[in-house]
Amino acid sequence: MNAYTDMGAMILRIVVEKVTNMSFNEFITEMIFKKANMVDTHLIVPSEKIERVANENFSSIVLSDGTVKTNYNNVKGTQHDPKAIAIGAKSGIAPGHAGYFSTKNDMINFANALINEKILTKESLYSMSDTETGFKDNDKYARFYGSLVFLKQPDPEFLSVYPPLSGKSFMSPGFAGTQLVVDPINKITLFVGAPRLHNRIYQIHKNQIPNIKIDSHNMKTFILPDGSEKIVCSDYTKAKEVLVTLALDLAIQYQLLEKIFTNEKGMHLVRELN
């Protein structure tokens, strides 16, 4: 059984609306977006910003006969999550678990607002990394989950947070390829926004697995009946983790150098060397 579910976030939306007498969209706009200066985060993208949306999520699946079926019905700037659509995201009803469009700047503003206690108190922020799952009998572990986030934990098989980060660190991944990492102790934040599904194959029938081609860089593509190739996203998560690990490693090293070179002249030298 997978302990992860987004149903809790959907239920939390209803609780928030009942307690505050506000729509969930109104609540997070006032309590999060404005406090974090998130000016480019929208449930319904304004028409003047549509061209800035990165993709339409034209994802594909391969059927048993090798036919590739691509979803071209998704309009740029509209949700593709089926549960979000069912709840009414395209009509302006915030689902609670998905459906918002944002930018890297807004997401870093959000992460920094968390660290700087503009949204939550330090106690509440730290409590997000209290594991709600993970412990098993005989000193064994499963994946650690906190308050709708993935946590740092001992077993490398289930590792979700880069080891050198503090024990209060947490990570929130997105199905479409995004990832937000927050370390409130070391004050390190990282956001990755990448199209895991757009113009890629995310599901292949077992009969067609032999038609997967792997190159020298371990990049997988699927050979279509006409001989052309289409990228397969099955290894996307692994590739993203390599990128995230390198970026966080650089951030930690840079932070260490800041402690060694305490003056601006010294850090200017470090920046020049990099």
What are these regions (language model features)?
Residues 163-169, 208-210:
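Short intrinsically disordered coil segments
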Residues 164, 174-176:
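Residues that act as N-cap/strand-start positions at coil-to-secondary-structure junctions
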Residues 15, 181-182, 222:
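Hydrophobic beta-strand positions
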Residues 116, 129-136, 154-159, 199-274:
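Short, gly/Ser/Thr-rich active-site loops of penicillin-recognizing serine hydrolases
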Residues 169, 176-189:
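Short, surface-exposed beta-strand/loop micro-motifs that present aromatic residues
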Residues 1-165:
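Short, surface-exposed loop or secondary-structure junction motifs
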